[in-house]
Curated annotation (Swiss-Prot):
Designated name of the protein: Virion host shutoff protein
Pfam families: XPG_I
Keywords: Decay of host mRNAs by virus, Endonuclease, Eukaryotic host gene expression shutoff by virus, Host gene expression shutoff by virus, Host mRNA suppression by virus, Host-virus interaction, Hydrolase, Nuclease, RNA-binding, Virion
A GO BP annotation: symbiont-mediated degradation of host mRNA
Family (UniProt): Belongs to the herpesviridae VHS protein family.
Function, in words: Minor structural protein that acts as an endoribonuclease during lytic infection. Degrades host mRNAs in the cytoplasm by cutting them at preferred sites, including some in regions of translation initiation.
Molecular function per GO: endonuclease activity; RNA binding
EC code(s) of this entry: 3.1.27.-
Protein species of origin: Gallid herpesvirus 2 (strain Chicken/Md5/ATCC VR-987) (GaHV-2)
Superkingdom of the source species: Viruses
Length: 441
């Protein structure tokens, strides 16, 4: 899931850093958004890597959830839980990458003006040559969470326990968890997103990969941009082809394939590339070569070029705080660059065009006046702790009285009471938490 090859790229280039939590550094709790299903199945794979016999799914679900809550408390993280398809898990996703892909496939690209020949054009262009060299296995590799013997996480049981324990959560039945997490991140509600899904990097978020380590590994979007030497919009434009929810083989490309292919094209068309060592290798739009043959404009207009940060060192980029990074590098130039997008011509371009528009609408503030821009945050629900409801719910789902009593004791006695969300936001963000508007001048 996510951006194909992004995790390998991050580890290969030293972009995965250890995050010192607030508890270890002596600070207050750090608000983070938790992509619940991604994290729960990650814990499930660590706790139960093999086949399990004779253990009910409700017991496994509650054990994993208790482990998650304990880890969050020990690392001094304050979670805002986000799950797909709303609180009850029965909503229909209308927005996001999966919904865009499903809609475009159902409507043959989303537009009747496209000729059938163009639907297969993206698979036959030279941008797919690098993938043709890869050896494809004869049998499709099944993910661990999709195996028959893998235990199932009970959706409603998880969310009900989270609600009765007093944790904040988001109930958005028509949205994917990734989009909600990105919204919480860019509205300065949370500082990080707990998820191993790298498409959050494509949406400009900083992600914590693994909570089980004492110093959780973290990938910062600004570090990825600095390593690639590009601004956010150029990053989104080039690597949307790596999104696994939008593309499949052979259209799907890895990050390294995009980098290698674009660097090779640059060397072919720039005569100074092989001789001038001071010029950094940069990435060109995916459709640049195709547009040169057809004589049409690229996704970039002639006046919009790749932003090379020659004067910005890696250290200075790491030292930038979240608000400065978000306001400066993510918002500036996106509205201008959005106007340079040309109408798509192929099915792949339609998918990518709609996803780019969706991402920008999700994370970029809407300009209301010349000085004020507003980005609305999804409503966050939080109720008081109800230990009686927690106990009743556990005993209703677990028939073994001894096991149920043990789990009830763990949740009630070892999980401390959750403080109000507004109190955490005020202590972490300061006066910024009181602002409902953000200026991007």
């Amino acid at each position: 899931m996510g951006v194909y090859g992004c995790m390998n790229f991050a580890y290969a280039n030293g972009l995965v850093r250890s995050h010192i939590s607030g508890f270890i550094s002596g600070g207050d709790m750090t608000p983070i958004a938790v992509d619940l299903w991604n994290v729960m199945y990650g814990l499930l794979e660590k706790l139960y890597p093999g086949k399990i016999d004779g253990v009910d799914d409700s017991i496994i679900t509650l054990r994993c959830l208790y482990c998650l809550l304990r880890l969050l408390h020990q690392r001094s993280y304050y979670p805002v839980f986000v799950a797909d398809r709303g609180f009850y898990g029965n909503g229909k996703t209308l927005y996001g990458a999966k919904a865009i892909a499903a809609t475009c496939i159902a409507t043959r690209g989303g537009s009747g003006r496209l000729h059938a020949r163009l639907f297969d054009e993206c698979g036959s262009t030279d941008v797919g040559e690098a993938r043709c060299k890869r050896k494809h296995p004869g049998k499709k590799v099944c993910r661990w969470s999709e195996r028959f013997e893998t235990p199932k996480i009970l959706y409603q049981l998880c969310m009900s326990i989270i609600r009765y324990m007093g944790y904040p959560y988001v109930d958005a039945g028509t949205m994917e968890a990734d989009d909600i997490c990105a919204n919480l991140f860019h509205t300065k509600t949370v500082a990080y997103v707990l998820s191993s899904d790298t498409d959050l990097i494509l949406m400009g978020c900083d992600i914590i990969i693994d909570l089980t380590r004492i110093f959780p590994p973290t990938i910062y979007c600004r570090d990825v941009l600095a390593a690639l030497q590009m601004d956010y919009f150029t990053f989104l434009l080039n690597f949307v082809r790596c999104h696994t929810d939008l593309h499949r083989e052979p259209t799907l490309k890895s990050m390294q394939e995009i980098i290698n292919l674009s660097s090779a094209k640059r060397c072919l068309h720039d005569t100074d590339c092989a001789t001038d060592d001071d010029v950094p290798r940069c990435i060109r739009p995916l459709y640049e070569e195709q547009d040169r043959r057809t004589g049409e404009n690229s996704y970039h207009s002639e006046g919009f070029d790749l932003h090379i940060r020659k004067d910005q060192s890696k250290t200075s980029c790491w030292d930038n705080d979240v608000s400065n990074y978000t306001d400066t590098n993510l918002i500036r130039g996106v509205q201008k660059a959005l106007k340079s997008l040309r109408p798509p011509r192929t099915r792949c371009e339609i998918l990518e065009y709609k996803f780019i528009k969706h991402v920008i609408a999700t994370i970029i503030p809407e300009r209301r006046t010349s000085r004020v821009s507003i980005l609305k945050r999804f409503p966050i629900m939080q109720e008081g702790r109800d230990e009686t409801a927690v106990e009743d719910l556990i005993f209703c789902n677990i028939f073994d009285v001894d096991e149920a009593s043990t789990i009830v004791s763990q949740f009630i006695k070892r999980i401390p009471e959750v403080r109000p969300l507004n109190h955490i936001l005020l202590k972490y963000w300061g006066n910024d938490a009181l602002k409902t508007t953000r200026s991007n001048d």
